[in-house]
């Protein structure tokens, strides 16, 4: 913190495993270690603590931890779920507000979905049985996918609530070189037509691809529009989970701000323009303790976006292959209605075009 950190963040999420399929080290941290690390932020007198909750530190635990450590906590994330768990989380949060606890759940206007291949099935890898395959070769994975005994082990794990339980009705085929006629179709629709079990069908379609690169889009959470509207208007929540470059080949929610201003302000009228801009700017700056940011006033740092409220929208998401080893990423770099971007008073982008001389001056 003395060196200039904005805070401390850690994860206990079931989705976070290393390349070997084992949980990342932070998921094993003991309560006293967690408290000591977080208290260092509080003792510094500034900064924020970020938590991705899980078994060893739940979202509800954050409301007990925060008064002990003395710094605001923001957790990832409060999203709508088909089981309605977000409703219980909102009640916990409201009770925390009544007690003066400084915890900020992160909410999003974006549905949380993953575009993933069966080589790196991110959400399925939360199953410990799937996770065993993460360090394995394609041939070894094919052998497992073919095995009915292995499939049954996965099912038993799901029955015992191990990992995220797939919502098969949300799975959509995005790329299937050996079955191009299925692209754009729901997995459950194909399963109903063929009399197949959705999980078996998914694996059989993957096995048709020599490299297992069947790509599917799977919905995880936050696809209940009424629930999202409620969360966006819940007191003491902050915008988050744009993912800031994580999972670059599987999702791109960098469009959160333009989607919020276009869909949820202009079209759906869930928020006023003023409230949405406030949530995107000053609420964030104040939470992180960034002084002289997030406001328009004389003497403040002039980081300013000029946009057209009538036309602002995210634009298309596209897949590009420009990473080492032919790595892929999703990008959304063609928004509409974005006219000017100023960093510290210097215009660095105009009508979608970067102004290189200004960038070279490093105004930030």
Annotate each PLM feature.
Residues 1-65:
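Hydrophobic, small-residue-rich alpha-helical packing segments that form membrane-like cores
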Residues 21-32, 50-54, 80-84, 248-252, ...:
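Alpha-helix capping and helix-loop boundary segments enriched in small/acidic/polar residues
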Residues 12-14, 19-22, 60-62, 86-89, ...:
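Short acidic, glycine/serine/threonine-rich loops at helix termini
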Residues 147, 226, 230-237, 254-256, ...:
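C-terminal cap of metal-dependent C-N hydrolases
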């Amino acid at each position: 913190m003395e060196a200039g950190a904005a805070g401390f963040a850690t994860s206990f999420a079931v989705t976070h495993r290393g390349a070997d399929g084992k949980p990342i080290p932070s998921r094993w941290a003991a309560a006293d270690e967690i408290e000591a690390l977080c208290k260092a932020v509080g003792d510094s007198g500034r900064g924020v603590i970020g938590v991705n909750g899980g078994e060893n530190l739940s979202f509800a635990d954050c409301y007990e931890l925060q008064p002990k450590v003395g710094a605001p906590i923001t957790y990832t994330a409060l999203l709508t779920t088909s089981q309605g768990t977000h409703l219980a989380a909102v009640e916990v949060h409201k009770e925390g507000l009544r007690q003066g606890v400084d915890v900020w759940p992160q909410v999003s206007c974006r549905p949380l979905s993953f575009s993933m291949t069966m080589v790196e099935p991110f959400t399925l890898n939360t199953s410990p049985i799937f996770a065993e395959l993460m360090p394995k070769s394609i041939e070894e994975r094919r052998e497992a996918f073919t095995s009915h005994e292995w499939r049954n082990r996965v099912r038993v794990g799901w029955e015992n609530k191990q990992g995220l339980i797939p919502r098969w009705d949300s799975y959509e085929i995005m790329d299937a070189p050996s079955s191009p006629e299925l692209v754009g179709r729901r997995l459950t629709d194909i399963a109903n037509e063929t009399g197949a079990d959705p999980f078996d069908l998914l694996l059989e379609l993957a096995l048709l691809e020599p490299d297992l690169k069947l790509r599917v889009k799977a919905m995880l959470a936050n696809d209940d529009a009424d629930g999202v509207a409620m969360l966006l208007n819940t007191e003491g929540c902050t915008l988050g989970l744009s993912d800031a470059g994580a999972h670059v080949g599987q999702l791109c929610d960098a469009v959160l701000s333009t989607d919020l201003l276009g869909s949820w302000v202009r079209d759906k009228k869930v928020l006023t323009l003023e409230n949405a801009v406030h949530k995107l700017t000053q609420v964030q700056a104040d939470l992180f303790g960034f002084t002289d940011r997030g406001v328009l006033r004389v003497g403040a740092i002039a980081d300013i976006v000029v946009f057209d409220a009538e036309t602002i929208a995210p634009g298309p998401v596209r897949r590009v292959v420009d990473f080492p080893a032919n790595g892929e990423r999703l990008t959304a770099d063609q928004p509409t209605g974005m006219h000017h971007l100023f960093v510290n008073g210097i215009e660095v982008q105009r009508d979608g075009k970067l102004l290189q001389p200004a960038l070279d001056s490093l105004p930030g």
